[in-house]
Amino acid sequence: PERPKIPDLDALPFPDRAAIDHAPYLDAWKTHHGASSINLVTARGCPYRCTWCSHAVYGFSHRRRSPANVAAEMAEIVERYDPDQVWYADDVFTISHPWLEAYVAALRARGIRRPFETITRADRLQNEDTVRLLAELGCYRIWLGSESGSQRILDAMERGV
């Protein structure tokens, strides 16, 4: 049976990153990718039902931590590990534009700006303000979900675009 979803992700503690020695991981990223990096997850799940995607872990429900909670974790990451960049490992980081605006404001209030890369969908970048917010936040690379020039293929994959 499916386990119940945790509705309030802010109630969870931050990952216990001190439980492992991060130096080898930071060094490996720097050696092989030119910058040290630490992952950060702001949400669980994805409401889209694309047929090719894996929903085995969090399913189709989308739950997100508050901007203030994520900004607090980011401050902890910067203070303890000072990575050159972060990887927002969400399924679709730009799923909520109002959340993104609030998160940018929360980081700005803390004086934090760190280069990052993330994953999203092309249809979540059609708003010029969203692209501006990502740039302001420090985004330098976006990994886009699989798309096609064929509407028949998009429909078969249930992309919803």
Locate the predicted segments by residue.
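Radical SAM [4Fe-4S] cluster-binding motif and immediate context
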Residues: D16-V161
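Glycine-rich beta-alpha loop elements in corrinoid/cobalamin-binding modules
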Residues: P1-P13
